[in-house]
């Protein structure tokens, strides 16, 4: 559900919740920092999970299923090899993006690439975005963009990479089933932004590097450093953020906003549907290789085979 806030004299969104993304173990020896999708912040419609991950071979995320939502993988350092039961295979390299619609079902793996040219740490972000009931069982699909093809612009000490949506007339190539804005900002010391956000969309900031201030510079604002998630309240249509650090370091953060779906949501691990009955059907489909999971029956990723898993 949307998070509301007290009205203010301006249209600037204020920070109503601040969370530190604690480390936890996922997959095969992998460590993630989870902010959305943990017990005290389960769901922020339409966002299900936000993980900042760090993996080094042989750790990773071997063969696992999904149904009913989308995953957005954005690499910050290193590269990840992706394989799925449909025969799709590719590498998400540093600065690159994969926007995967799991739809009615996919089984895939995400592991550090064996061709990482000596890179020992592979870091990135993975965001899960819910789909409406009419889109949950669409055919799986991918949108993949290399770093050089992501829309990017720089002005007045502010660099922006447009992952989804647009900034100052610069538009992303990504088509979003659930309307979403995803911007990667880097602010040099002393610089600031005033970024429009659709009035009724839920929005958050996640800080990747440095120390910044978010909110209304004249009324109320929150300071945050790396690994902090800031939930922005409703009641405004603008984010103000600035790098007031004396350290001389840049401030890097993502701003993500999405239109709430407003439907019932039931999640069981990697399956996200609208009712418990649909979850039970999904588990049955997966275990019996039906209705979207047919090709998973005899499939095992090359990465899992190399590690002797499954």
From Swiss-Prot:
Main localization (coarse): nucleus
Entry superkingdom: Eukaryota
Pfam families: Pirin (PF02678), Pirin_C (PF05726)
Alphabetical list of InterPro entries matching this protein: Pirin, Pirin_C_dom, Pirin_N_dom, RmlC-like_jellyroll, RmlC_Cupin_sf
Record's GO cellular component terms: nucleus
Localization, UniProt: Nucleus
Keywords, comma-separated and alphabetical: Nucleus
Family listed: Belongs to the pirin family.
Protein name per UniProt: Pirin-like protein At1g50590
Organism of provenance: Arabidopsis thaliana
